[in-house]
Amino acid sequence: RLGADAIRDCDGTEFPQELKDTGAKIYATYYTTRKDNAWAKANPDETQQCYIMTPFYTAADDALTIPLMTGISRELMMVNDHDDITRLWEVIDRTTGEPVPTADWHYDAASESVVIDAPAAYHEYTVSFLAYLIWDPVHMYNSVINDWKDVEHQIPFDVRQPKTHAYTLRRLREYLESHPYVNVVRFTTFFHLFTLVFDELRREKYVDWYGYSASVSPYILEQFEKEVGYKFRPEFIIDQGYYNNQYRVPSKEYKDFQ
């Protein structure tokens, strides 16, 4: 009746039977990396992760404590202190630009803070760390912007990792078989997540619809090192806190990562 070429769903909606029965061409949005919390909860080791940097903290004359999750929504992220933090995290003296040796700092799990035992007085420091994305950033964005109520937080999973990769292929086949009314599958988010960060009040802290910093994991970083032949540094992605947004000139290392 409206003369539409096709009917399409979107995040937060499901096709009602009335639309399926119209005879119109149907486009269906398919979520490769989410909308299956049963799988995500059963395989937390293959949850998507991201690199995040703390604010700058200035040292005085004694030990400096840097809380990791200040200014970050705990609905969105959870610190990954399960994997080797001495290899995957990086503490940087931003005054000199040099990384702080791992022997000179330690992690206090109870307070989720990094403690630098003997920092240089009045130097500024940051911590770059890995965090699990426990709420898909786009799903959170859509939920916040549209003020959705009582919506289960969709957990993103990394389709590049072995178990989830095999499951994803099977899941897609099953989807096609169980949705015969769909004419065109409109994929969204093949494997990498946009870098969308919210604070404790669900306010937008950092939004980049082109970024790759929310698509990392120890598994992927190992693949990176094997392919390029040199050691990965969190700073390749953190980029002094700019996260390699589209206004930055990318480094060789970041282009290698892409």
Model-predicted regions and their roles:
Residues 1-258:
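Glycan-processing catalytic domains of CAZymes
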